From Swiss-Prot:
One of its GO terms (molecular function) is RNA binding. This is Cop9 signalosome complex subunit 12. Transmembrane segments: none annotated. The keyword Disulfide bond does not apply.
Length: 423
């Protein structure tokens, strides 16, 4: 069966056969033959389409040869050549897309996605090669962003978020925080100006994984880079709620999307910090994530337990032993701020159980717990001074409603909600 690539451009549509032609790693069925016949096209369009067709054929051929080279241990050069061809194909397709309507957005995204996959396959690729891929994908993004087609049902702006996700991926690979920040600012300014549709009215809504991914990247940006923890929590929570899952009745378990682990790694500490929300480890969905993730199972149950119990020594031990992990995830600031939450919880427990909820509590009651970090060489007065400083910090940050009496060495709690953020 002949499949004419030119017909798709004549009819302004795509199907799985066109997508399979674009995907270099999809083998062409024996009874299928891709051809190009488009006699009505102008000379310039014909040249571009012919080149696009030839690049598609070359990529499939190069990929099949790459598989044999992989067995011989000569994979590096083959990968670089495949990446070069894929980048050239996307550059050319960008020029074709400029004159098309939004029917072509998804085929363009498939092409850009496979370029990123190629770039991520090899850890040996130099920075320049990855940046070149990023520039080509950015061109795809700007074509969508700046489309001036007055017919909204044909406008390519609906594809902005899907290409933004690809750009986020590249910038994270390059550890380029400035480019991430610029991309977020561009998108938000355009949304606020009503120049592009919001996420829930974009093409991403037809591909829910893209909605999950976009909210994940925004949650990571606000929660870990901008330290806007409330906003970070909001986007990560949205990402989690949109994650697809499948319940397998025969096993009684949930099959979860892999992205959920990444979301939970950021969401759990942000939920503890901003909302005092604790995960229910016995919930079947959360249990499924924990079972699959060594990082989650080894770190977070202990961290959550330290916050709930107000156990400062357990918190300090957890933060110290997993410091490298928290740094790699951009969570160092969040975990540091959690220390005040743990301390406040400790104060609350002393107020509840050691002081019978009286409004005035001597500081010696709190000091007697010996769970705050103090030096063995410090005398009691020095320890009380250090404790007052910590309490003053908690009061100033709004974690406690109280005031300190230095002369009486006590803390006086508000009679109405002395612990406003406790759960």
């Amino acid at each position: 069966m002949d499949v004419d690539i030119g017909c798709y451009f004549e009819e302004k549509r795509y199907d799985d056969k066109l997508l399979d032609f674009i995907r270099y790693d999809v083998k062409t069925p024996k009874k299928t033959k891709y051809i190009l016949q488009r006699p009505t096209a102008t000379d310039e369009e014909s040249v571009r389409l012919q080149r696009f067709y030839q690049l598609g054929v070359d990529l499939k051929l190069k990929y099949s040869k790459r598989r044999s080279l992989k067995k011989q241990g000569r994979i590096k050069n083959a990968t670089e050549e495949l990446l070069r061809l894929a980048n050239e194909q996307l550059k050319l397709f960008n020029r074709i897309v400029e004159r098309e309507t939004n029917w072509i957005i998804y085929p363009l995204w498939v092409m850009a996605k496979q370029l990123i996959r190629l770039a991520n396959e090899s850890s040996e690729l130099n920075k320049d090669s990855i940046e070149e891929c990023g520039r080509t994908i950015h061109r795809s993004f700007t074509i969508c962003l700046n489309d001036r087609n007055p017919r909204l049902n044909e406008n390519k702006k609906i594809g902005c978020y899907m290409f933004a996700n690809l750009e986020f991926s590249i910038y994270h690979r390059l550890s380029n925080k400035d480019m991430i920040k610029n991309l977020v600012k561009v998108l938000e300014s355009r949304v606020n100006a009503r120049d592009i549709p919001p996420l829930n009215k974009s093409l991403a809504m037809e591909h829910k994984s893209q909605v999950v991914l976009y909210n994940y990247y925004l949650g990571q940006y606000y929660g870990c880079l901008e330290n806007d923890h409330e906003r970070g929590f909001f986007h990560l929570n949205e990402a989690l709620l949109q994650c697809p899952m499948l319940y397998v009745e025969s096993t009684g378990k949930f099959v979860l999307q892999g992205q959920m682990e990444k979301i939970m790694i950021l969401l759990v500490p942000l939920a503890l910090l901003t909302k005092r929300l604790y995960p229910h480890w016995d919930h079947p969905v959360i249990a499924g994530v924990i079972t699959r993730s060594k990082r989650l199972s080894q770190v977070y149950p202990t961290l959550v337990r330290s916050v709930i119990s107000g156990n400062l020594s357990l918190y300090e031990a957890t933060a110290a032993s997993h410091e490298r992990f928290f740094l790699s995830q951009g969570l160092h600031v969040v975990i540091t701020l959690l220390r005040e939450v743990v301390f406040t919880r400790l104060v609350q427990r002393c107020w509840q159980w050691g002081n019978d909820r009286k409004s005035i509590m001597p500081l010696k009651i709190l000091l007697a717990t010996k769970q705050h970090d103090s030096s063995a060489n410090e005398d009691e007065e020095e320890q009380l001074d250090a404790l007052e400083c910590r309490l003053a910090s908690a009061i100033a940050s709004g974690l406690l409603r109280a005031y300190l009496s230095h002369s009486n060495r006590c803390i006086v709690f508000s009679k109405k909600e002395p612990f406003p953020h406790s759960k």
